[in-house]
């Protein structure tokens, strides 16, 4: 086994490390240790604490990271990343999930898990990661007519390739395998029970992952993946599995949102006011599209929701933005008090 088989390309080879160190890739993350594979072996490594003491949590190694590792199994540094997937927790802190992948596979099942709002959220973080998003719709055998699902995807994921697969019959995998570049790293995103583990087994051609069935009463799956882990498949693809995430916060980088909602962003360019909030201003092209049916209310409301969420996280992480928002509301409240004092009495 060579490190090149684990995606060690020139981008990482050109990043210099000490002559006494080795290049490695993190294949699993545990509480206090990291599983690392190098050119010669695979072992558990720990952080050299002094090198990471004052760094943020996003500077710590994640599954998929290439690292500099010492002869005594200590991680000395993390190499520059090509792509990264993170999420915001309830305290508006960024949590790193995976790094250095080529494709972000958004896995949803064609049962009660299929949710356009959640799909738009996943697409936002997938585009923001820098990787190519792909939609995987599992349990296609449960649906007789896929037309309705295809039409819904057109409204929120235009241009993003979607594959309808059946993990049992292997239907749909030939097209996916034909389109994926060889030796690529894939990260799987999706809720628990959508069939991510079964999907990996089908892609690998063997029972690599432990799987569990779904409850018949609500079509929800049992949770089988408990930590983030990388797998090298015999066909050359590298797969990063992640625990199911039904709800997660988006960050405050607008790039992913603008790509996912490119149709709304294009409409917004036609608004009369450059700072239009797209809620009540005259001459709003977005509101006009709502009225004539060009834009659906669900798509619009989810866009606004994610916009507000990003703005909230940005303020939480930027004292200047938080202060600016407080000052804005002070002006609004002052104007309201002045209006109430000067309005004619009845």
From Swiss-Prot:
InterPro entries: G_CP_dom, P-loop_NTPase, Ribosome_biogen_GTPase_RsgA, RsgA_GTPase_dom. Zn(2+) binds at residues 271, 276, 278, 284. One of its GO terms (biological process) is ribosomal small subunit biogenesis. GO terms for molecular function: GTP binding; GTPase activity; metal ion binding; rRNA binding. It is an enzyme of class 3 (hydrolase). PANTHER family: SMALL RIBOSOMAL SUBUNIT BIOGENESIS GTPASE RSGA. HAMAP family: GTPase_RsgA. Belongs to the TRAFAC class YlqF/YawG GTPase family. RsgA subfamily. Monomer. Associates with 30S ribosomal subunit, binds 16S rRNA. This is Small ribosomal subunit biogenesis GTPase RsgA 2. It comes from Listeria monocytogenes serotype 4b (strain F2365).
